[in-house]
Regions:
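P-loop NTPase motor module signature
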Residues: 1-454, 461, 547-555, 560, ...
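Extended, charged helical/alpha-beta scaffold domains that provide interaction surfaces
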Residues: 440, 446, 453, 457-693
Length: 693
């Protein structure tokens, strides 16, 4: 299809007329109508770049890349040039960039130095219906900009999900509704029953395939999916010829379902493609390719395919009705990744994926009664997430009345209190909520407050392990690089064992970093060791950018100090996750109890009285992830003010918060005087980093 034939471009005159009469407009249209790619071009052709850049925010890195590439090709140019993009640790813009695609976090960073966005004529907030925390914060800040700049324009781009809330927020601004031709989609409610005869008639009879299938924790789900595909391929449904889109809650279930389909009786007729956020750009773009002749494309996706990705040719949608959603507890500073039923609006977005190019069918793997009991819209992220980073950025902008900031949806008071407490534990805020010197230093890094705080601690107190602390921050900024392919778990764990260190995961990260960075053939290294190359390359890139930030501050990047100093620096940022053992395999932090070390940790089933964790997450139980051991003396070095409280957790003695360090030094458990290894198992010498500037 010619992009100019898309519904959005066809309504160019309506959009520009509304924008000429209003500072803010909401553009609402279905996914796939061209909002993301055609609105920037419409603005560029209308001359909006003459008085400043056209800024487009995206909630995801992968969209930032693909959108900038698509728009550049449509304008017959290359990136960077007239079109450029910017995201965390990656700036691909040029002096003549007129259309700037950026992650929403980048716009927040830029507003720190230019609160009224003087270099922009217009900002388009794309995918606003997702209501991420950054999107809500951006909308609040942009509202302040239009109060000062009469020449500034805002477009809020939304799929057909509650666009009225944006109009009300911006003083009843107009909503430009643009319909896209949609074909009818039949809905079939086909609820999952408990697994009984576990899909034996759909699975090939090899022992290996049966083992893959029976290991799954979602046998009934996969049985239902196989039965629907069986009916579709036999021609026993009303489905038009076309491809299949399956919505599943997470990466794990997608991989398991992929294995089931690839070992089914229909495997030779299916072109199965996974789609989730952690995949690289090239892997994600496979979903847009046509299947090989004689095959049907089956895309198995998370909710990323609801509104962020448009896949033509889908005629059958199989909707589990589930998504994995993060919920944060501000009282315990812990997160929970919960598989939860999606809202009615999300269900309907999924259904609509089947009717873009021809009539379709949506199989809902839940009952009509279940659907009718669901909430109309998803819970906004601001009501279920950690607010400490947003509050830190607000303080940086001089906004200290957190409770009365004009968010489109007010966050819970408990969430604000918890975020303030978290920032106070990191020494980031003064009593009047202005930034302390430590808080100001933290803001130099585009990281979560806990990660920037560990870097600041290394700068101020442990300069000899600054490089190692930057590596730790890079690892905690990404997903796990360890891969456990179904059916190869034993081999993968044996490979990962090569990087294990008795001082826990944070020491193991250093070994893995050194081994990967020194590997000549990084692809082969990752294949041999069951590691995710894209994640490790991302870690290298983050480390390089953190090096640049620190160097720009005029601070030398030391390395090779003691393992104890390294763990102290890391633990100061992670003070919320310093825990004491309270029984066999059980730990408590200052705010959470009944914490177990995750089985994937080096420290699983290891004996330690005190530990530090990169995060504490509730899944089936409360788990500490990324764990290393600590000694009593280290606890005093990490936080003299909180040391007595933390140690009392081990002793089970109630004690008030200590305001000063005790003179006594408890007997050490684990030595913190050893030095970081000079040589890893890979033979790479651990040395000071010579920065290539």
């Amino acid at each position: 299809m010619n992009p100019h034939d898309l519904p959005i471009y066809q309504q160019k005159a309506r959009i520009l007329e509304a924008l000429s009469k209003n500072q803010v407009i909401v553009v609402e249209s279905p996914t796939g109508s061209g909002k993301t790619t055609q609105l920037p071009i419409i603005l560029y052709e209308a001359g909006y770049a003459a008085d400043g850049k056209i800024g487009i925010t995206q909630p995801r890195r992968i969209a930032t890349l693909s959108v900038s590439d698509f728009i550049a090709r449509q304008l017959n140019t290359t990136v960077p040039g007239v079109v450029g993009y910017k995201m965390r640790f990656e700036d691909v813009t040029a002096p003549n960039t007129a259309i700037k695609i950026m992650t929403d976090g980048i716009l927040l960073q830029e507003m720190k130095f230019d609160p009224y966005l003087s270099s922009y004529s217009i900002i388009m907030v794309d995918e606003a219906h997702e209501r991420s925390l950054n999107i809500d914060f951006i909308l609040g800040l942009l509202k302040k900009v239009i109060d000062t700049r009469n020449d500034f324009r805002i477009i809020v781009s939304s799929a057909t999900i509650n666009a009225e809330v944006f109009s009300e927020y911006f003083g009843e601004c107009p909503i430009v509704r643009i319909d896209a031709p949609m074909f009818p989609v039949q809905i079939r409610y086909d609820a999952i029953r408990p697994a009984s005869d576990i899909g034996s008639k759909y699975i090939s009879s090899t022992k290996e395939s049966e083992e893959i299938y029976f290991r799954s924790s979602d046998e009934a789900l996969y049985e239902k999916i196989l039965s629907i595909i069986d009916r579709v391929l036999r021609g026993e449904t009303d489905a038009e010829p076309g491809d299949i889109l399956i919505f599943l809650p997470g990466e794990k279930t997608i991989k398991e379902c992929l294995q089931v389909l690839m070992t089914s009786r229909w495997a030779s007729q299916l072109d199965c493609i996974p789609l989730y956020a952690r995949l690289g750009k090239d892997e994600q773009e496979r979903v847009f390719e046509s299947p090989p002749p004689g095959k049907i494309k089956v895309v198995i996706a998370t909710n990323i395919a609801e509104t962020s990705v448009t896949i033509d040719g889908i005629t059958v949608v199989i909707d589990s009705g589930l998504a994995k959603i993060n919920y944060y507890n501000p009282k315990t500073f812990t997160a929970s990744l919960i598989e939860t039923p999606i809202s009615k609006a999300s269900c309907n977005q999924r259904k609509g994926r089947a009717g873009r190019t021809r009539p379709g069918i949506c199989y809902r793997l839940y009952s009509l009664k279940d659907f009718e009991s669901r909430p109309l819209y998803p819970t906004e992220e601001i009501r279920r997430t950690d607010l400490s980073e947003v509050l830190l950025r607000m303080a940086e902008l001089g906004i200290t009345d957190f409770e009365h900031f004009d968010f489109i949806t007010k966050p819970p008071k408990s969430a604000i209190r918890g975020a303030i407490e978290a920032l106070n534990m990191l020494d980031a805020l003064n009593p009047d909520r202005s930034l302390t010197h430590i808080g100001e230093m933290m803001c130099a890094f585009p990281l979560l407050p806990k990660l920037s705080r560990m870097i600041v601690e290394a700068i101020l107190k442990y300069p000899g392990v600054l490089s190692e602390t930057l590596i730790a921050a890079a690892f905690l900024s990404t997903t796990s690089p360890y891969v456990l392919p179904p059916g190869e778990e034993t081999e993968a764990r044996a490979a990962h064992h090569r990087f294990r260190d008795p001082m826990g995961d944070f020491a193991s990260y250093l070994k893995l970093y050194e081994a990967f960075s020194s590997a000549r053939d990084k692809t082969k290294f990752c294949e041999h060791n069951y590691l995710d190359e894209r994640t490790l390359r991302e870690i290298l890139r983050i480390k390089e950018q953190l090096d640049l930030i620190v160097s720009d501050m005029g601070i030398p990047i030391g390395s090779g100090g003691s393992i104890g100093d390294y763990l102290c620096a890391v633990s100061r940022g992670l003070i919320q996750f310093v825990c004491a053992r309270q029984g066999r395999g059980m730990f408590s932090s200052l705010t959470a109890e009944k914490i177990h070390i995750h089985p994937g940790s080096v420290m699983f089933r290891q004996d330690a009285d005190f530990i530090v964790a990169g995060e504490i997450v509730r899944t089936t139980r409360m788990y500490a992830m990324s764990v290393s051991p600590l000694s009593r003396s280290q606890i005093y070095k990490i936080s003299p003010e909180l040391a007595e409280q933390i140690i009392a957790l081990k002793q089970k003695e109630p004690v008030s918060i200590s305001k000063g360090r005790e003179n006594r030094e408890p007997k050490e458990g684990i030595s913190d005087r050893g030095h970081l290894p000079k040589e890893t198992k890979s033979g790479h010498v651990f040395k000071k980093h010579d920065l290539d500037r």
